[in-house]
Amino acid sequence: MATNIRKTHPLFKIINNSLIDLPTPANISIWWNFGSLLGMCLIIQILTGLFLAMHYTADISSAFSSVAHICRDVNYGWLIRNIHANGASMFFICVYLHIARGLYYGSYLNKETWNIGVVILLLLMVTAFVGYVLPWGQMSFWGATVITNLLSALPYIGDTLVQWIWGGFSIDNATLTRFFTFHFLFPFVTAALTMIHLLFLHETGSNNPTGLTSNTDKIPFHPYFTYKDLVGFFILLFLLTLLALFTPNLLNDAENFIPANPLLTPPHIKPEWYFLFAYAILRSIPNKLGGVLALVFSILILLLVPILHTSKQRSLTFRPITQILFWLLVTNTIILTWIGGQPVEQPFITIGQIASITYFSFFLILFPIAGWWENKMLNL
């Protein structure tokens, strides 16, 4: 009998083992769809970004005008720009849901996969930040000023580091040029890290909602999950199209329609919505260095989750106490997102401080204690 080329060809064999004949747990739910959705988001962002880069000018005198030119004069430029800007929002929605799935079902116990995932998240956040600076509107300029200035809080090297990143003594043309370079480069680095993420995942195989081993009950990825994932693709594309065509500026800041002016500070400097939870944590600490550390650890704390896992069970499916804590953490993060978009005044300051303390408490104290308590109750 002739052997199938997809199983013998050196390149096709890799694709086959990753996407076609991959043994997949039969019971994985729609929450396992977000990995492939993120892959699609990355491809959409790279393609739309590539076409935008063909018409964009990385120069402070013409950056803002070049974005206006793309939207007005380039064929379907408005559509490409709207898909790229709103695609970033859809990307982060999928990222946060993907992480939440990992936390809920204990996927973080695949340590290598989880750790490389956290690195991908950090790289995505840097990519989105430098990309937000490129239109050179008011919020682009002042957002870049505020966030890069945070590095000056680092002892001894801070000021030198900030000037090195700026390429001068203030945010100027050199800064915009290098930010454009980084924004172009990082998505390809992200794609490479995604391959490593998948490599580590396929070493252990996917987790499943029960958190139990699924070696006795696996089915091929194609056709079952290729078609299941296609449903997710269509839903995501529908939502993205809806956003890009009907309310393209819903998630934008109106301040960014004003060209950057170093002499005029906007009333409220804030990042895009997907960074507001971390921004709220940053602002809730009165000390500059303390705020920067809290900001960094709000993401890096994910690296501690596998170490602080105390339960005998992997998933939260059969752990009602930790389930309640998980949904409280989700609510807490939503509250932080809301606070991040509010002005720095009472009662928002106090709410932000309480929400920041509880955010870290969930990871460092409450989840480990709940896991230990549930173990005790299992022994009753």
UniProtKB/Swiss-Prot annotation:
The keyword Oxidoreductase does not apply. Its cofactor is heme b. One of its GO terms (molecular function) is metal ion binding. Signal peptide: none annotated. The keyword Transport applies. InterPro entries: Cyt_b/b6_C, Cyt_b/b6_C_sf, Cyt_b/b6_N, Cytb/b6-like_sf, Cytochrome_b, Cytochrome_b_C_euk/bac, Cytochrome_b_N_euk/bac, Di-haem_cyt_TM. GO terms for cellular component: mitochondrial inner membrane; respiratory chain complex III. Disulfide bonds: none annotated. Its main location: mitochondrion. It is found in: Mitochondrion inner membrane. It comes from the Eukaryota. Keywords: Electron transport, Heme, Iron, Membrane, Metal-binding, Mitochondrion, Mitochondrion inner membrane, Respiratory chain, Transmembrane, Transmembrane helix, Transport, Ubiquinone. One of its GO terms (biological process) is mitochondrial electron transport, ubiquinol to cytochrome c. Component of the ubiquinol-cytochrome c reductase complex (complex III or cytochrome b-c1 complex) that is part of the mitochondrial respiratory chain. The b-c1 complex mediates electron transfer from ubiquinol to cytochrome c. Contributes to the generation of a proton gradient across the mitochondrial membrane that is then used for ATP synthesis. This is Cytochrome b. It comes from Hemitrygon laosensis. The gene is mt-cyb.
